[in-house]
Each structure stands twice: as structure tokens, then as C-alpha cells.
């Protein structure tokens, strides 16, 4: 485990906790895309099926369990507990445009044509684009709460840190996974515009708002 | 070699 991977995991975990706490403390999921959260629940479920087949470490297992459990808790809060505060009118991204192509691609480009491996590949592809409904919602409403911006930054920087982890692993362990690397690059590129706004606005104490 | 099958990351 190198420092980039560890910091990536910590930032991913922070993002998940920031979102859970934001919704729970404010008793509201305003400004949060339920569709993106649903996609993340699908991502974790399909990727971590190896919890039942493969043990890597106590760290690995506990993180997976926390990610899966918190993604379901978030979906439950948005679609059940705090349903009245969910802004479905602005959450209009068509998720089938993400699920269908990534599902097809995972059948075509994978490391091994087995059910578990195809599901893992699907989860990698789907994760790379799962934030789009959330980014679409922010661009549609033209603004995001500061706490939501922190959530998005932590979530975006996690995969960026993983890119450095993969460079490290290629250099020192001769390990590389082209599927994860390409998807990770796509995922990071999707956040670039948001990173720019976060650094130029949110870090200077302003609310993230887009020009009309 | 491509060793992507070792899924030891999160």
C-alpha cells in the first residue's frame, strides 16, 4: 500500500461520510442526485461480490463493507427517510444512457469472460461516469451548497490519487490494470471543470454558483 | 504483462 492509494481511500471514505452526515444532520437531501447515489450503490455491489470469494486483508474487507453499507444508507435516506426533501425535478439525467453502454462495454472489453469478472469490469466503467447525474443537477440548478462541493471534491480527488498510485505500482511492482487506468482517467477528466470551480470559488469562501 | 486480474484495490 503506497501513500497515494491510502490517501485515495481516505478521501473516498471522507466523501461518503461527508454526504451521509450532510443529509442526516440537515434532515435534507436537497441538491443531491439520488440517481448518482443509486449508481454508486450498484457500483459497490457489483465490484465487491468478491467479499464472498476472495480475502485480501482486514483493511480491504472492512473498507468494502463500509462502502457498500453507507451507499445503501444514502440511497435509503434519499428515496425513503427524507424523500420529501429530494429534488427529483432537477434530477433528470437518463441513467439508462450510462448503464446500458457500460454494461455492453464490460462484455466486450474485460480481462476474463466470467460472471464475476464482467461484473467487476462493469462496476469500473459505471463508476467512471456515475457522478454525471450529480454534475448535471449542479449545472441545471446553477449552484451547489458548500458542503456538497466538499463532497464532490473529495470524491473526485480519490480517483485522481489512484492515478498516482497506478504510476507508482507500475514503477515499483510492475503492476498495471489497463481497464482501471483508462476508466480512472475518464473519471478524473469529468471532474476537471468542477475542480477548477472548487479551487477558484469554494476555497476562497464563495458558494459554488455557475454563470446563468 | 497485464496483471489486472488481481483485484486488490478498492
UniProtKB/Swiss-Prot annotation, chain A:
Membrane-protein topology: Multi-pass membrane protein
Lumenal compartment segments: 1-4, 53-58, 111-116, 169-178
UniProt subcellular location: Golgi apparatus membrane; Cytoplasmic vesicle, COPI-coated vesicle membrane; Endoplasmic reticulum membrane; Endoplasmic reticulum-Golgi intermediate compartment membrane
KW Transferase (keyword) present: no
Keywords: Cytoplasmic vesicle, Endoplasmic reticulum, ER-Golgi transport, Golgi apparatus, Membrane, Protein transport, Receptor, Transmembrane, Transmembrane helix, Transport
Site (Interaction with the K-D-E-L motif on target proteins) location in chain: 5, 117
Record Pfam families: ER_lumen_recept
Region (Interaction with the K-D-E-L motif on target proteins): 47-48, 159-169
Site (Important for recycling of cargo proteins with the sequence motif K-D-E-L from the Golgi to the endoplasmic reticulum): 193
Keyword Methyltransferase set for record: no
Important for recycling of cargo proteins with the sequence motif K-D-E-L from the Golgi to the endoplasmic reticulum: region residues: 204-207
InterPro entries named among the record's database cross-references: ER_ret_rcpt (IPR000133)
A single GO cellular-component term on record: endoplasmic reticulum-Golgi intermediate compartment membrane
Broad class of where this protein is predominantly found: Golgi
Cytoplasmic side: 25-32, 80-92, 136-149, 200-212
GO molecular function annotations of the record: ER retention sequence binding; KDEL sequence binding
Residues annotated as transmembrane: 5-24, 33-52, 59-79, 93-110, 117-135, 150-168, 179-199
GO biological process, one term: retrograde vesicle-mediated transport, Golgi to endoplasmic reticulum
Known function: Receptor for the C-terminal sequence motif K-D-E-L that is present on endoplasmic reticulum resident proteins and that mediates their recycling from the Golgi back to the endoplasmic reticulum.
Family of the protein in this entry: Belongs to the ERD2 family.
Protein name: ER lumen protein-retaining receptor 1-B
Gene assigned in the entry: kdelr1-b
